[in-house]
Amino acid sequence: MTFKESAINESFWRNFSKIYKKPALVNKYLAGHSDEIEKVVITNFNEFNLSSEYSIYANGGFGRREMFPSSDVDLSIVQHNKNSKNTEGLERYIAKLWDVGLKVGHSVRTIQDIKKVAGKDPVEFTSYLTRRSLISSPDIDIKVNDILSRSWGKKKFFNAKYNEQEERY
């Protein structure tokens, strides 16, 4: 499967002056671009028969269906158990996404890894909190949601996000 991201981006920039004047057109473009990328991500995930051992989530702009031209495709891949055998298939999957021209940023974690990182890092916690399921099972979604609900108290999370913003800006 080939992906024509450059054609999509060229179309966006060629029509930018018309699109920019109408926010609804911008939103339509961003969602459409996200949907095209999602098709590539899911089709290739299925091609490598990964769904029995992994779940895949969209994060960031991709997760919100707000893919701007040349944005990274942020993926969170959850390994169903630490003894998954198809790691080679997963590596080939990521390589294929790069080969078709996607700028993929990804993490591969077990449920236990998510518990550790989400409990310590408010950025990672927020990333998992705002994820969008592409291919997953209800069982995995429940486990991730359970981890997130136990990771941060409201006050602790607010303070961590406040400090993050202070450091960033």
Map each language-model feature to its residues.
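Charged, low-complexity surface segments at secondary-structure and domain boundaries
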Residues: 1, 143-150
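Active-site nucleotide-donor binding segment shared across nucleotidyl transfer reactions
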Residues: 37-87
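Generic alpha-helical segment signature
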Residues: 5-9, 86, 158
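Generic secondary-structure boundary/loop-capping signal
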Residues: 27, 59, 64, 126, ...
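Conserved catalytic core of two-metal-ion nucleotidyltransferases
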Residues: 34-42, 48, 76, 87-143, ...
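Metal-dependent phosphohydrolase cores
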Residues: 1-3, 26, 32, 77-80, ...
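Non-transmembrane, amphipathic alpha-helical segments
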Residues: 22-29, 33, 85, 150, ...
